[in-house]
Curated annotation (Swiss-Prot):
NCBIfam families reported in the protein's UniProt record: TTQ_MADH_Hv (TIGR02658)
Residue ranges crossing the lipid bilayer per the database entry: none
Family statement: Belongs to the aromatic amine dehydrogenase heavy chain family.
UniProt-recorded name of the protein: Methylamine dehydrogenase heavy chain
Lineage: Bacteria, Pseudomonadati, Pseudomonadota, Alphaproteobacteria, Rhodobacterales
Length: 426
């Protein structure tokens, strides 16, 4: 008997197991879609809606429609036109070679769709909602082999690619995704990306012509803050900003005044409003520097403190990944904070302080109720506060004025970190 069992071909064993699993799945499906007293599809969906995720509700509605004979052909839906509350969640997936970006309606918490990306993709979104895009990297054999860097531009309604632009010589700086290492120019005509090696440079991608344009030699400075179609700023090691003008085919670099000292260490994720030119940059201790960037120059504002002297003495500090958000219409700053040891600035936080950017006055201190890594705000008159947990892969959505949690969206990949929005309201 033992020899007979051992001689059973492995493929027959696998086929038998597969058929058994299929039969079990079919029985479960019949149990779900053939109730003793059938209900109309709409009634079934309504009855099952409580306690279900968006995906579960959609699956139940589709199953009911199929059972009623109302739908038997696949349908590819289109997303509604973008608004100021649409939010993009980029999941670098802990340095995985294949990644995802989730597109969510912040008003409802509904996932509208997803796009795929490669290694350490960098997302951008046109402020007017006309497109969203990413700079990304893929390899010939998934995680090895020939490397290709490219920029992919997506239609915001169909999510289909409308441009796929290869970057010569694989020039992208592959680093944990920092929000402002890539940027769109204010006219949406060019995407700017950073090159680290063999020498510092900024690449220009012509989105209208759907082609790579050129590399601009820049000093050893970081981040890209566009102030006009041909002028952007970068942060330099001496505490100044480099103003880079690349009009007329030439690159001219000048430096602003030094705006912070050597021991005033800036976090890696400032907030920047492409529409107003406001740069908001906290330090590790919660001191916030601000500048207004224009094509002509930079104007620095008096620094403000996000935390009180008592809070700093009690080890309150900023922390997280994307720690800072700025709301243009209300001129308010949002900063992730918590009690933490020094040099723990990348650890998640449970609180957000809300500040008047003009006066430095604290407006609110919101207890989030979750360990949060990244924040952003919708750029409408009554903004939502988006708070993202990489650990639980969940986006929590709050009323930015009251701090009340309104809804949440879970199952967002493996380690989501970056939150991007459109600033399309007046």
């Amino acid at each position: 008997m033992a020899s007979a069992r051992e001689s059973t071909p492995r493929y027959l064993t696998l086929i038998g197991a597969t058929l058994a699993c299929s039969a079990l799945a079919l029985g479960a499906a019949q149990a779900q879609t053939e109730p003793a007293e059938p209900e109309a599809p709409a009634e079934t969906a309504a009855a099952d809606a409580a306690g279900q995720t968006e995906g579960q509700r959609g699956a139940a509605e589709a199953a009911a429609a199929l059972a009623a004979g109302e739908a038997d052909e696949p349908v590819i839906l289109e997303a509604p036109a973008p608004d100021a509350r649409r939010v993009y969640i980029q999941d670098p997936a802990h340095f995985a070679a294949i990644t995802q970006q989730f597109v969510i309606d912040g008003s409802t918490g509904r996932i509208l769709g997803m796009t795929d990306g490669g290694f350490l993709p960098h997302p951008v979104a046109a402020e007017d909602g006309s497109f969203f895009a990413q700079a990304s990297t893929v390899f010939e054999r998934i995680a090895r082999g020939k490397r290709t860097d490219y920029v992919e531009v997506f239609d915001p309604v169909t999510f289909l690619p409308i441009a796929d632009i290869e970057l010569p010589d694989a020039p992208r700086f592959l680093v944990g995704t920092y929000q402002w290492m890539n940027a769109l120019t204010p006219d949406n005509k060019n995407l700017l990306f950073y090159q680290f090696s063999p020498a510092p440079a900024v690449g220009v991608v012509d989105l209208e012509g759907k082609t790579f344009d050129r590399m601009l030699d820049v000093p050893d400075c970081y981040h890209i803050f566009p102030a006009s179609p041909t002028v952007f700023y970068m942060n330099c090691r001496d505490g100044s900003l480099a103003r880079v003008d690349f009009a007329d085919g030439e690159t001219k670099v000048t430096n602003t005044e030094v705006f912070h000292t050597e021991d005033e260490l800036l976090i890696n994720h400032p907030a920047f409003s492409l529409r107003s030119g406001r740069l908001v940059w906290p330090t590790y201790t919660g001191k916030i520097f601000q500048a207004d960037l224009t094509a002509e120059g930079a104007t620095f504002r008096a620094p403000i403190e996000a935390l009180t002297e008592a809070e700093r003495a009690d080890d309150w500090r900023p922390g997280g990944w994307q720690q800072t958000a700025y709301h243009r219409q209300s001129d308010r700053i949002y900063l992730l904070v918590d009690q933490r040891d020094e040099w723990k600035h990348k650890a998640a936080s449970r609180f957000v302080v809300v500040l008047n950017a003009e006066t430095g006055e604290r407006i609110n201190k919101i207890e989030l109720g979750h360990e949060i890594d990244s924040i952003n705000v919708s750029q409408d008159a009554e903004p939502l506060l988006y708070a993202l947990s990489a650990g639980t892969q969940t986006l929590h959505i709050y009323d930015a004025a009251t701090g009340e949690e309104l809804r949440s969206v879970d199952q967002l990949g493996r380690g989501p970190q970056i939150i991007t929005t459109h600033d399309m309201d007046s």
